[in-house]
Amino acid sequence: MQVKEYFKAICNNDISRADGVSRNSDRTKRLMRSYARHQGSQASIPTILADIATNETEDLSDETVASYLSALRKIFVIEDMPAWNPNLRSKTAIRTSDTRYYVDPSIAVAALGLGPNDLINDLNTFGLFFETLCVRDLRVYADALDGAVYHYRDKNGKKQAFFFEKRVFLQK
């Protein structure tokens, strides 16, 4: 199935099947477009909502957007990256907002209706999609090693895009 057809299936059918709640396909498209514009960032639900509202004729609530995002998570379309915290008792102020990502960058490309020439002519956007591709692959490798991938950003803006941590379990 081509990614454009997959995108249509998500918007028209799959999102409502996630939890049996009927959802508006046009609203889903606008949400997925906004999410694609914010991938790789720690955009809050109100930020995404404000982005959607520029093209929305009716008011949406934070709860509605959260419900749509939850459904997209359930059907494995999006997977946010949690923040890494070095130590629970650390005095260092760490930003703990999740970073927004599609599980596959091609879904974001389809949501924005982009093609190869669009990406070649906008290298900043291309870079965000490449980052999403790296996140996807790192998650696959981390999972095989029983690890997880995180992002890190402190109060001064120092950041590490990807941080791998292997889970270690102590046995008696």
Where are these regions (language model features)?
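Accessory nucleic acid-recognition modules appended to NTPase machines
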Residues: 2-169
